[in-house]
Amino acid sequence: MGNNLRIRGLNSRYILFLVDGERLVGEGAGGNINLDQIDVANIKRIEMINGAASVLYGSNAVGAVINVITKEPQEAIAAGCDISYQSNNTAKTRVHIESGQNKFLSQASIYRNSSDGFGAKGDGAYAASYADWGGNMKLGYKFNARTDINGTGRYFRHESFNPEGSLNATHPLTHNFSAGINGGYKSDNERYSLRASVNYDKYFDSDRYERKDETALSGTASNISSRLLNTFKPSEVWEIVAGAEQNHEENYSVKTLGSTPTTKSLDDVSLFGQGQYTAFGSLDIVGGARYTYNFQFGGAVTPKLSLMYKWKDFTFRAGSATAFRSPSIKELFYNFDHQGMFWVYGNPDLKAEKGLYNSLSAEYSGSRFYASAAAYRNDIKDKITQYEVVNELGGLEKYYKNTSSATITGLDINFSAIIFRHLYLKGSYSLCDATDNATGEQLSGNVKHSGTASATWNGNFLKGQYSVQIAGRFSSPHSYSSSGKTSLSKPYNIWKAVITKRFHLGKNDLNLTLKCDNLFNFQDPTFINPGRQYLIGLNYKFN
């Protein structure tokens, strides 16, 4: 789930999730995003911009922008199938077919994932059993080398089940559907280009009855966005980008926005512009601004400035940017009784959060070694936080308010090295001090120290490539709230071992994957993990 993700001290409310540049809709008024709806096998790469460093993106891009770029067809025609089986009866299957012949491209895939979950007997962390299935489609046509049009579609169904012996009368069933169209034009000399897109994304939340074949709709969330992007290169040293964006978000709920069915919506429109100048062939200066008018909170201008200098194998960067995040529908309008356990109340008087992000970084990129270090500071004013109150009857109530401010400072260090041609080492360390300036305490959920490490051996055996990898991540304790009390989690380190082997079968390829997750079987009630798990996977590609 996307709500478990944190980047540089900020949770998913401050992260903008995109697929091929288009926003993902959140799950109802809560706004959390189920990342399982993304077909992992179809990911080409993931681009991430830390902080509010780009004028191309608006509200919610305070902490980071994550853009998942999907694959394009590379063969005249190709097809494949993926199968994997893991502990806890976790099974994943996927089939796909694609064609990139001449001017027309097409791509389609369907998949099904299921698991028995874990912890149903009350022994540690719990995750419900589930069954997912979904599909993706992409169609494109190139009129000529300068003009193209593309259509996309995505569907995802997620059903999670109650544990054995549960007295619940229903279990959750959700659907996601998205469709989009985009097109572009570029001039003969490629100095001028224009792209336009429209995307529609809708989420359906339902309750599925246990003892009868009926489903009751409990809520929906939808987002319609349109975008126009114009790029002009008047010379070899100048690039100018300008554009406009519109977003309409709408939530309907029978229970979370009040005791009666209610619909709430938010709208914003944006204009943005950016200029990039290259001086002396090695210094890039990028400056720009974005104006966003939110129909709930009014207008805001967010300027940005960044510098990048290259010298031999070194690259140095510096940047300063402002940002804002408008409150979500949940933070504004929630009025929800959570099964008698607690109440959540929104606050329509909340103000938009504003941020100032500054960063410095240096990196070295040689033929066999890479290292980088980045320092940053993110000052957020009017930060929205949730606080808990025990009422006179002993019931727990949760509210939202703007705190005075929060300051987040940190340091990220990364390195990778190729040793003896076959051995690839990689590691990272992050220090993040995220302080609520009103209390002097760390922001809830912030991990102050974290890191990763991996060693991968690549080689050839039986006429095919293979790799053996050991990888781990570690985390220092973090605070969390439970039943009105603040507690501290345990520190942990989690390791995995992965073996992959490719077999060439004529023109086709067979890939075998063997994996052991949570190698040393770390378990803790605050850490949602079933313990040690084993996986075997097969991928067959027809060319």
Which residue stretches match the model-derived regions?
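Short acidic/polar hinge/loop motifs at secondary-structure boundaries
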Residues: 23-50
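Periplasmic-side early beta-strands and strand-to-turn transitions of outer-membrane beta-barrels
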Residues: 55, 67, 74-76, 96-174
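Face-selective signature of the C-terminal outer-membrane beta-barrel domain
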Residues: 107, 142-157, 173-298, 303-310, ...
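Outer-membrane beta-barrel signature, preferentially recognizing the C-terminal barrel domain
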Residues: 167-186, 219, 315, 322-380, ...
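Gram-negative outer-membrane beta-barrel transporters
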Residues: 278-285, 376-379, 401-479, 539-541
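C-terminal beta-signal and adjacent terminal beta-strands/loops
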Residues: 381, 425, 474-481, 488-490, ...
